[in-house]
Swiss-Prot record:
Keyword RNA-binding: no
Identification of the protein by name: Tritrans,polycis-undecaprenyl-diphosphate synthase (geranylgeranyl-diphosphate specific)
UniProt-annotated catalytic positions: 35, 83 (proton acceptor)
EC number(s) given by UniProt: 2.5.1.89
Amino acid sequence: MKNRTFSVFYRKYEQILEKEILSSEIPEHIAVIMDGNRRYAGQLGKARIFGHAMGAEVTEQVIEWCYEIGVKQLTLYAFSTENFQRSEEEVGGLFNLINEKFLKLHTDKRTYEKEMQVRVIGDRTKLPAYLNESIDRIEKATEHHRKFSLNVAIAYGGRQDIMQAVRDIATCVSSGKLSLEDVNESLISKHLYPAPGVPVPNVDLIIRTGGDERISNFLPWQANGSECATYFCAPFWPEFRKIDLLRSVRVYQARKEEKKREHSYRISKVKNFLRVGKYENKSEDLGQLLPLKKQGVS
């Protein structure tokens, strides 16, 4: 009886929260650091691969939830370059699990009903042949889809991504294909994974589960460039709920509103300054607008 009551309350709260966030701007690009699979398994006395398998089930749900609320791009941190330091058994089990999910995406009618494009970002030279074959198959099957984009980061490291882009651009410059004047932010973005191709856009919101409050070398170019919102939550990835996703979107929306208020406040201060007309004696006041701190504005 108690569990049923809680379930009804939970569902009602979820509906209220979803209605609230749908009345405001939805982030176009969400990136997720899916942390806590191994600790989740450890708490239950299970093998690590059990935690990864449970996490993979949640991943399928999160793709659905993001699509439902209007997110356009979802990037998932599935396997970092540092993860290669784990045991051969665990790495092999992870690759098998990821491969199964790509095969399922390829045959799942929802992939095509949603017009979902699937791409992998990362150093694919480090991946086994069977996994690369599955990646090629799903990328080819969905390459013309544009309604929803799923980017899966495998063998990915943010610093390594920037380094390979810089090396590629340097090679183009030295061979005469590019000049130094051609190098700008847009060009660098085009040489990041999954180069060649449409670059992964700036991130609006990064979510990390499992309690750690760090970004872990994930999409540094796309995240810092857009000053994206971040949402850290305690549940391990297999415990992640739709309510957690909706709460993260609410944090993004609150941050957007805060930035709008700050911008309006600064503009009003500048207008007031110009209205007074004491430019020479008050010029130093303009510099105070940059580090401005006011109650309700940060």
